Design a protein with these regions (language model features):
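RNase H-like nuclease fold core
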Residues: 1-45, 49, 54-62, 134-135, ...
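RNase H catalytic domain
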Residues: 11-18, 52-136, 141-143
Length: 146
């Protein structure tokens, strides 16, 4: 299986508000950046969308090294919380509804197609690719500001 390294980030001005997402995919010395945004969204929806779009860009099952500064995304996947939420009808252990079940459902279907490895990185720090994703996500969010 090919190994693809993926860096993702999401941004939102206001929460909710205009938002953007970005992913950088690296494979065999090549790099591809994809990005987009929405007029009214949340930061967590943009973080999820970045990962979803990155995985949708893969044409075959891969080993995916995912780097994100979103503890929401990394913890829910790495610790299995998202699968638990789905099993309980999108209810969390605190009996509150899990947010963004539409995106989580899509993401869980995508991650099941790959061998996933999750890495949390501190945002706005020394990870150059994550910083580039952040900058692009912010630019995407600005396209929707009035």
């Amino acid at each position: 299986m090919k190994t693809v390294t993926v860096y993702t980030d999401g941004a939102c001005s206001g929460n909710p508000g205009p938002g953007g997402w970005c992913a950088i995919l690296e494979y065999n010395g090549h790099e591809k950046m994809i990005s987009g945004g929405e007029e009214r969204t949340t930061n967590n929806r943009m973080e999820l969308t970045a990962v979803i779009q990155a995985l949708l860009a893969l044409r075959e099952p891969c080993v995916v090294e995912l780097y994100s500064d979103s503890k929401y995304v990394i913890d829910a996947l790495e610790k299995g919380w998202a699968w638990g939420w789905r099993k309980k009808g999108w209810i969390k252990s605190d009996k509150k509804p899990a947010l963004n079940p539409d995106l989580w459902e899509m993401l869980l279907g995508l991650v099941s197609q790959h061998e996933m490895w999750y890495h949390w990185v501190k945002g706005h720090e020394e990870n150059e690719k994550n910083n580039r994703c952040d900058e692009q996500a912010v630019l995407e969010s600005r396209k929707f500001r009035t």
